[in-house]
Amino acid sequence: FYVPNTRSAVRINGMQRLQGEVVISDITRTHWADSYRATVAPGTTPIAGKPATELDLTATDPDNVYPTIKLWVTPDTDVPVRAQFFLASGLLFRSADFSAPVDANGRKVIRKITYRNEVEKQRASVVDILDGQPRKIPSGWFNPDTLADGQ
C-alpha cells in the first residue's frame, strides 16, 4: 500500500475493507489449498437445489484471518459453490456464494462472488471479474520513487 510522503511500505491488515463487504484477505490472502487442512463431511447438502459436498477447513497458520471455513463444492468437479467464514471466537462473520465457472482464455474461472455480512445481514457486496486477461504490470508500480513522480 503506497502513501505519499512515506518512505516505507504500510502493511494492510487482512480485515481492512477494499470496498463494501469485501476485505483484503477475501481476495488476496485466503489460499484454501495451501493454508487450510480439509475434512470432508459425510453426505451432501443441497445448495440452490443442487447437491454439494461440505469441506470443513481448519487454518494451518495461526495468522490466517479466518481460522475456520466451511466450503461447499460440487461433488463431481470440486468447484466452490458457497463458503462460510468464521472468526476465532466461532462467530460466523461472512459468507460467499460463487457463480458457476465460465471459460476465460482456455481456463475455467469463477466470474462472480457475492459476499454477505452475517452480522449485519442487510450488507452484501459483489465482486464481478469482467476480464480474465493476464496483463504485464509496469515495474514502476512497485517502486515508491516512481509512484511519487506520478508515473
Per-region residue spans from a language model:
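Gly/Pro-enriched, hydrophobic low-complexity segments
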Residues: 14, 31, 50-144
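An acidic-aromatic
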Residues: 1-25
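Short, solvent-exposed mixed-charge patches
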Residues: 150-151
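Short, conserved active-site entrance elements at the starts or edges of catalytic domains
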Residues: 20-58
